[in-house]
Amino acid sequence: MSSQTERTFIAVKPDGVQRGLVSQILSRFEKKGYKLVAIKLVKADDKLLEQHYAEHVGKPFFPKMVSFMKSGPILATVWEGKDVVRQGRTILGATNPLGSAPGTIRGDFGIDLGRNVCHGSDSVDSAEREINLWFKKEELVDWESNQAKWIYE
């Protein structure tokens, strides 16, 4: 990984998996030119979700959110590339799908805040923390993309 690249954590939530949106969501990141370095289907438990959403523990919506996130499989992914954290959030759209622009994942596939299809890290520090929660170091694959020379100067 070069000094200009970073990694982000993107999760397709149970609603996105159940609705068959996985391939369309992954393709948005691939078409942008980002490199997939880790992927797995996960049934999250309370401990993982409490660590992931630590800033929301104790808030009124937290139990319902955890219940939803445990309701089905989550596709956990790690993407690598230049400015991928910020650009990943742009690709996803606003947290509330009704405030998301058409052309974003949430703008195209979401309606309700509680079913917003995806999660994306909101900072480089959050990305590192979330990647370490969801993946073991050996699950992150370091590989050279042949298309990188066509994407980056």
From Swiss-Prot:
The active site is at H119. The N-terminus is blocked. Its cofactor is Mg(2+). It is an enzyme of class 2 (transferase). Keywords: ATP-binding, Cytoplasm, DNA damage, DNA repair, Kinase, Magnesium, Metal-binding, Mitochondrion, Nucleotide metabolism, Nucleotide-binding, Phosphoprotein, Transferase. GO terms for cellular component: cytosol; mitochondrial intermembrane space; mitochondrion. It holds the Pfam family NDK. Major role in the synthesis of nucleoside triphosphates other than ATP. The ATP gamma phosphate is transferred to the NDP beta phosphate via a ping-pong mechanism, using a phosphorylated active-site intermediate. Required for repair of UV radiation- and etoposide-induced DNA damage. Present with 7130 molecules/cell in log phase SD medium. Belongs to the NDK family. This is Nucleoside diphosphate kinase. It comes from Saccharomyces cerevisiae (strain ATCC 204508 / S288c) (Baker's yeast). The gene is YNK1.
